[in-house]
């Protein structure tokens, strides 16, 4: 089983988008085949906020209870890393690579665990490459 860090935007790609992006679909298939996603502690808040925002803006193409059921079905397979990196590390990554603190947390987790990063975010991909972190394809 291969571990990887899962960016919230990728998971939202298969939870909200109908159909999901090709990349989100490939990542979901890797999970079905046994790859284990790792997420930073704020992932749950980021996903929850995105769902609330999408619902308020009437952007959800599926019912929220169906989306929540899909998330709950995934939760046993997602490992939450509850050891946040220190603030200096996150701020430093953010400054050097033009990342938000949230995106720096995903990047730092991938670096610390020495696992690939699943993201389509251009700034995160650029930061990961400069840090020799592989991008899940």
Spell out what each predicted region is:
Residues 76-116, 120:
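Active-site neighborhoods of divalent-metal-dependent phosphate/nucleic-acid chemistry enzymes
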Residues 48-78, 89:
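Active-site-proximal, substrate-binding regions of enzyme catalytic domains
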Residues 30-32, 73, 85, 92-96, ...:
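Long, hydrophilic "mature protein body" segments
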Residues 42-45, 102:
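Aromatic- and histidine-enriched alpha-helix N-cap/loop-to-helix transition segments
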Residues 10, 43, 85, 106, ...:
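Alpha-helix capping/helix-boundary segments
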Residues 1-42, 54-66, 131:
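Short, well-structured N-terminal submotif of metal-dependent ribonuclease cores
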Residues 1-3, 80, 107-137:
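Acidic, PIN/NYN-like endoribonuclease modules and their adjacent C-terminal/linker elements
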Residues 23, 46, 89, 126-127:
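Phosphate- and divalent-cation-binding pockets in alpha/beta enzyme and binding domains
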